[in-house]
């Protein structure tokens, strides 16, 4: 568990929290809780490394769990690139997203932000700055398998063609 207070907010993170949902044990990769005054925002987190894909079954299960627990969101992280900010990486019943938000971050996006923060000294605390730089080193290391992508996926074909044809 990590706690970090900033501007009246309190951030708590949990690794592999365990829940019982529909008579089975469910263990997402993480849980993030942000408190500000009496307001609380909570999200389940599912992370995939390398080329491991997110599955609709798993993401839908976490959306159902988040709804049952009264959580606000499910955050997925993978190497999958999406064509827009509101796109989701799997095909699930969108009606289940009425009360629970589903947000996706790619490792490329996370790496870009981490490098930017690290290069421009956006982190004041020396220990946190060191941890961030080590995280960037990990993200860039060949063994992490998070240092880029080989295929932008089918959603990007229209963008490529639009640039090529000058129709964007």
Task: State what each model feature region is.
Residues 1-168:
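Charged, terminal alpha-helix-loop-beta segments
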